[in-house]
């Protein structure tokens, strides 16, 4: 599906931009030009994870796709679990390899953490996708049997409980106590609703002008809101940058719909590039932190140029390096099947 390939390619580029820009956002002061430039890249790319959820929904909830409970539990979930624990263990061992200093006690403790589901931070996406896959038979049955009005109501209900209320709660603006304090959904459960939105937007996409408008609105919320909150606090205040908060979700919806409009019109060479990027996106997501951690170990930072230039430059090096590694790994059948 061309739309999904292009969207996944855009999403993985943005994942790397987020991770490269996170360092300056955490270490530098909000009242500096460098921080504001870093926030630009951190905001403009913030839709990456919800865009991946939208892509998953567009593919996995498609009525024409046969997806049985047996396939989910004998192929999809074992694939995710194998990849998750392999890469989590690899991230534990990697720092010792970089420094060529093998501390058995430290490695043992790290591997125990892996068994206890304490993994490299960015692997949280796989934790969520395990639940998304487990719920697929229910999500598919629920969506495919509802009439259009009830589906629209369900999406609105999810948007309020899974997007708006959690954002208000994180900002300290949801003052309800008792049971109402439990109304906001966690990001993990909200991701299921996001996949449903992806399915709905593939069937009935936003118009081009509307897509552009919601992208700009989402960016304004991320950049303007985060800048204002951070300047007030004196350090990064990231509530409006969270994956399924309103800003990133608005941008993701707009970008997903624009990809549907643009993808069929791309020249063949770019279509092939988008297809390659889409296929490699999962592997790049899993492995790109190796390159970024190597940057940190060897002292490669964004300080060689203004962040407006250095962040995309480092992201490009990381992407190309990781893509090359994933391409080589994909030639090994067992790795291609289970680990990327």
Place the predicted regions along the sequence by residue.
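C-terminal "closing" transmembrane helix and its immediate cytosolic amphipathic cap
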Residues: 263-275, 289-340
């Amino acid at each position: 599906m061309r739309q999904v390939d292009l969207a996944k390619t855009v999403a993985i580029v943005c994942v790397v931009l987020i991770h490269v820009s996170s360092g300056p956002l955490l270490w530098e002061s909000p009242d500096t030009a460098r921080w504001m430039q870093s926030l630009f890249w951190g905001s403009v790319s913030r839709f990456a994870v919800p865009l991946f959820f939208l892509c998953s929904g567009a593919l996995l909830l498609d009525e024409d796709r046969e997806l049985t409970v047996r396939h989910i539990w004998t192929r999809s979930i074992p694939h995710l679990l194998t990849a998750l624990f392999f890469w989590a263990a690899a991230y534990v061992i990697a720092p010792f390899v970089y420094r060529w200093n093998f501390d058995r006690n430290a490695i043992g403790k790290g591997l125990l953490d892996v068994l206890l589901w304490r993994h490299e931070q960015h692997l949280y996406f796989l934790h969520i996708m395990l639940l998304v896959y487990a719920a697929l038979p229910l999500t598919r049955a629920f969506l495919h049997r509802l009439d259009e009005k009830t589906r629209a109501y369900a999406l609105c209900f999810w948007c309020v409980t899974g997007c708006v209320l959690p954002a208000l709660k994180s900002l300290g603006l949801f003052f309800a106590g008792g049971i109402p304090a439990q109304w906001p959904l966690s990001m993990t459960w909200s991701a299921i609703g996001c996949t449903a939105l992806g399915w709905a937007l593939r069937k009935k996409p936003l118009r081009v002008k509307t897509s552009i408008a919601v992208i700009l609105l989402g960016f304004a919320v991320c950049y303007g809101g985060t800048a204002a909150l951070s300047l007030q606090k004196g350090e990064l205040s990231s509530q409006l940058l969270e994956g399924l908060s309103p800003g990133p979700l608005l941008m993701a919806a707009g970008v997903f719909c624009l990809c549907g409009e643009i993808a069929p019109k791309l020249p063949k060479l770019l279509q092939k590039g988008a297809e390659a990027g889409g296929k490699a996106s999962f592997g790049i997501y899993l492995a790109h932190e190796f390159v970024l951690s190597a940057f940190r170990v060897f002292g490669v930072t964004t300080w060689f140029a203004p962040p407006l230039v250095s962040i995309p430059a480092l992201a490009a090096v990381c992407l190309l390096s990781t893509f090359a590694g994933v391409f080589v790994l994909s030639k090994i059948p067992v790795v291609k099947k289970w680990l990327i």
